[in-house]
Amino acid sequence: MKRFGTYSRRLVIAAAASAGLVASAGMALADSIKVAAIYTLPVEQQWISRIHLALNGAKDRGEIEYVFSENVANTDYERVMREYAEQGVQLIVGEVFGLERAARKVAKDYPDTAFLMGSSFGPVGPNFSVFDNWIHEPSYLSGMVAGAITETNVIGMIGGYAIPEVNRLMNAFMEGAREVNPDVKFLVNFIDSWYDPPKAKESAFAMMDAGADIMYAERFGVSDAAVERGVKAIGNVIDTSADYPNTILASALWHMEATIDKAVANVASGNFEASDYGQYSFMAYGGGSLVVDPNLVPDDVATKVAERETEITDGLFRVNVNDERPVSDK
């Protein structure tokens, strides 16, 4: 696979140092920070896996002590947050899309604990920070790949829920495809689930029957359908090309390392405060990247995409953020 904007620890440390984010590069913290993560899904789930990977990386470097709870129901989430806070955990990481108000109430009750939560809303002082996978930039680039390669000019798109965090990635993908192919049309559907491969697969088959020859796989199950029908797919958040050989044209990848490194450094220095960490998922910070399969993507397409990526990382091209629900063209 050919990687565009490939994440490397060297890149993130360089970006962080230039912005005054870390005191020194490559050095483990003198005293490891106690970190706990709370996940509503298994750590194998694509979105959760990126957070888990970044935290394990910090643990392996001796920067943090890391424990986690997975498959925590929304109804039980507040209790688990309180238990970790009572245990003296210094930084609690998680995702609170289904319990925004309750999570903020817990944070208010533990002002000396730092909270970093995936959220649809903003931070709340003094200690509740938020993040999300702002990978609209590589999503745009993956759209350019799809728009250039489709032969039927019909692309199918299947998402989990029509929430801003998903919508912005799908809209960016559509804009990227239209940049290189104004004639492309989209079929869009949401399965109203974060994990229902059979339902996603069924929806994908219906789109293929309607002429889609490339599928945007925001959820698991879509790429399985693509393999069965011999059409191509675009990946999201993680690289699944090894699991679906000769199928994944490109993937927009999310790297949580920059976000975690920033939060841990702030806790260690005593400077953690409520803020929005979303920018650390941008390509300029190494928080997002594009990976393409050179065996499936022609060189001229890859070159054009790489040129656009350089413009993005140099600040010469801005990918629009559109949180509105995407809709089908036909």
Which sequence ranges carry the predicted segments?
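Extracytoplasmic "Venus flytrap"
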Residues: 34-61, 67-77, 97, 162-168
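An alpha-beta-alpha
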Residues: 55, 141-184, 188, 276-297
